[in-house]
Amino acid sequence: QEVHAPRKTYSDSTNPHEVLDYTRFISQGARSFVKMQSDIIARYKKPEDFITTNGIFGNLDSHKMTRESLDFITYDSYPNFAYCLDAYSDAPGNMKDRKWSRNLSTVRSISPVFGIMEQQSGANGWNTRMEAPTPRPGQMTLWTMQSIAHGADYVSYFRWRTCTMGTEIYWHGILDYSGRENRRIREVREIHRKLQAMKDVAGGIYQARVGMIRD
């Protein structure tokens, strides 16, 4: 079947049915690729190993992908993108980092058991621009607990150490370029200590009192 990329018409709009067809085509192609990789991994992994990937993306049916190929899905949580250095950050009605609660609830709707593949631990940016400021003292703890409170059963931080080369040289991690002790690694240790006292919540299923429908 031939699927055409949607193009704007004379009225500067697209055909909504063509857009839907194209989006479904992109989603199906991506899901098929994930399924191919998942099947290979499943043949060789240990029984206790899990298969996951991180998302979520608007042009991908993550619900189907999770059912077809994954044990659970994971999410990349970067709340300080809400304060990025562009026009979007100050757009009217922008809920800033408060919308991350909605994002986490959306992930939970895809996979009741889910994890955080990348929890923000430093300032974020590429070699072309800086997008998000450094977390303030205590913010890593706040975001980690927010993820867990929304049902995350797994949290990992991106990245361990800020890389010294490549496109993401300004994407800071727990450690700075020097790899030396800093306040962020001390905060991670404190987070670990707090989570040791909360380990009984691991594996629990989040009980939501409110349901959201997004059309």
Give the label of every model feature segment:
Residues 1-53, 57-69:
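Active-site neighborhood of glycoside hydrolase catalytic domains
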Residues 68-73, 151:
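Glycine-enriched alpha-helix->loop->beta-strand junction motifs that scaffold or abut catalytic
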